[in-house]
Regions:
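Membrane-integral, polyisoprenol-dependent glycosyltransferases
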Residues: 1-361, 552
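Membrane-embedded architecture of ER/inner-membrane glycosylation machinery
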Residues: 163, 284-564
Length: 564
């Protein structure tokens, strides 16, 4: 018991270091993060926690639980920041990892559960989602925890009421719509049916759970409809029905079926490489059985499969297949399957350590080389050994800006600590290579991967990503227009998916409003040079003057309508 408690504290410490230390180091640089954060900002500033209006005219595209979480985290310090906006995702990932460890430790052993937790935490897709201000990590955590709780309910033969599962399903519904409630129920229902439980008992039991899970979301939907009316109803239909049927009013992340396979393989970097290397170490037998015999063997294997393994397999297969159906596909939709893939991968890694340790040695050597290479490139940039002429083409100027950002980033105590941690991790791995007993070598490899992610979050990525951010533009505009509305003018407006100056709007405190929504007589407007040329053609009755704010693509203009 004491040993298990120590492992829990160690895992919690790893989660905190991996997720919370550098959440706010990178500015918002994509439209997705500030689009969610500004909804929470509108909630706090306008007091509307049901259906707040942001960007002057927009209502949120997703239900409000994620935005409520941001608002609660931000209310503690009195303002919405990059850190507080990303905090709900980090908390959700930590909860998913910790609950997953407890679930698998009880049923499959502490070691496989601990390795599973580390794999979940240190793969590219999950780590990125856990440090971003997007709804997907919260949705995935609630779905996965609901699956664990429904499994525990199934162990009790569906006796009692799974209150925690119902709350998680309600939360998932309030995060991104009914899919968050439907999929966990479907997975568990199929599992119990395969295990021989009566179909109608399963159906009515999960129908009751689904109804109970809809109570809180239904209350919000009613309140939101009273505020938003038909516009809100159309948005709900678009996001939850038409998106699944591929009949949205605009193209949204449309990708072929194989896209999901590619994204999972890419999302599990660096461990995809480990699996690829291991394929050369395995022994293969010639396949002689006919397809009908394969099917019979598969059914027999499933019948004899451990319950936890079958549950994990079904979670992967059903959720994966479900998200292959709609045209709209994104890598983050598949986040709920990552912990279950991690479980099977954990078993596989422990097998490799026992039977083919050379695979872990090769993989660890590659990761150690990547770590050293990162440091060599970083210090080469700082020494000025890389000339600007190395870059050419369309993005040459931006790439040079990235390089100079790394070249001039100040090295403080934290920076040197991160560099030292990378070197220590490599040293520990090299030491383990010299030992005859390699039963713990996988933890040295995890240490290297952990320090790479930590250094990327805290040292290498922020200066590069901050170059892409429009925060300096917003700060320049704020000095000239400290109060009042700033208007925006953008071309190629798409119905249902309008373009907005999300980053600038967030950093200006939700003061940016589309010009067409108000048609003001005078004021300030942000637009690109091409856009302002079109504006002048379409509105010849306006005088427009550029206000210098720096060498940016996005410009600030002062306009006034001619009254003569």
């Amino acid at each position: 018991m004491q040993k298990n408690r120590n492992v829990v504290w160690i895992l919690a410490g790893i989660c905190i270091c991996s997720l919370f230390l550098f959440l706010g180091e990178s500015y918002f640089h994509t439209k997705g993060e500030p689009r969610e954060a500004v909804v929470a900002l509108a909630m706090l500033e306008k007091g509307n926690w049901i259906l707040p209006v942001n960007n002057g005219v927009d209502i949120a595209y997703k239900p409000p639980l994620f935005h409520w979480c941001i608002a609660v985290c931000s209310a503690v310090i009195g303002t919405v920041t990059e850190y507080t906006s990303r905090m709900p995702s980090a908390i959700a990932l930590m909860a998913m990892v910790m609950v997953g460890y407890a679930f698998f430790a009880k049923r499959r052993g502490r070691e496989v559960a601990f390795v599973m937790a580390l794999l979940t935490l240190t793969n590219f897709e999950v780590h990125r989602a856990g440090t971003n201000c997007r709804v997907d990590m919260l949705l995935s955590a609630l779905m996965v925890i609901a699956l664990y709780q429904l499994y525990k309910w199934g162990e009790k033969r569906l006796r009692g009421i799974p209150w925690i599962a119902i709350l998680c399903l309600s939360g998932a519904f309030l995060t991104k719509g009914p899919v968050g409630m439907v999929l966990p129920c479907l997975v568990m229902a199929v599992f119990l049916w395969i295990r021989g439980m009566n179909f109608w008992r399963i159906f009515f039991s999960f129908f009751g759970v689904a109804l109970a899970s809809c109570v809180l979301p239904f209350a919000w939907y009613v309140a939101a409809y009273r505020q938003g009316g038909e516009e809100f109803l159309q948005l709900v239909l678009e996001e939850n029905v038409l998106r699944f049927l591929g009949k949205m009013s605009y193209e949204s992340h449309e990708n072929p079926a194989y896209y999901n396979v590619v994204t999972v393989l890419a999302g599990y970097v660096p461990y995809t490489l480990l699996v690829l290397i291991s394929l050369f170490a395995l022994k293969y037998r010639k396949v002689q059985a006919k397809p009908r015999e394969w099917w019979g063997r598969l059914k027999a294997y499933i019948r004899t499969m451990d319950d936890t393994r079958l549950f994990s397999l079904l979670s992967i297969v059903i959720i994966f297949v479900f998200y292959c159906i709609p045209k709209s596909k994104r890598s983050v939709y598949l986040l709920p399957i990552y912990p279950f893939i991690a479980y099977f991968l954990a078993e596989y890694i422990l097998y490799l350590v026992r039977v083919h340790p050379v695979v872990m040695k090769i993989f660890g050597s590659i990761m150690a080389s990547v770590s050293i290479l990162l440091l060599l490139v970083f210090f080469s940039l700082r020494m000025g050994w890389v000339p600007d002429t190395i870059f050419s083409g369309r993005h040459a100027e931006e790439n040079r800006a990235f390089m100079h950002a790394l070249e001039t980033v100040p090295l403080d105590v934290v920076s040197w600590f991160l560099i030292g941690a990378m070197l220590v991790a490599v040293k520990c791995f090299i030491s383990s290579l010299r030992k005859k007993d390699v039963r713990m070598i996988h933890y040295d490899v995890f240490f290297i991967v952990f320090t790479i992610f930590l250094s990327l979050d805290g040292l290498f990525q922020p200066p590069v990503l901050n170059v892409k951010s429009q925060k300096p533009i917003a700060e320049s505009i704020a000095r000239i227009v400290p109060q009042g509305t700033v208007y925006s003018y953008q071309l190629n407006e798409v119905k249902g998916n309008p373009l907005r100056q999300f980053i600038v709007n967030f950093y200006l405190g939700d003061r940016v409003v589309p010009f067409y929504a108000v048609s003001p007589v005078q004021g300030y407007m942000v637009a690109e040079e091409v856009e302002i040329a079109v504006f002048k053609e379409e509105h010849p009755d306006y005088r427009v003057e550029e206000i210098p704010i720096g060498d940016y693509r996005l410009r600030l203009y002062q306009f006034k309508k001619n009254t003569e």
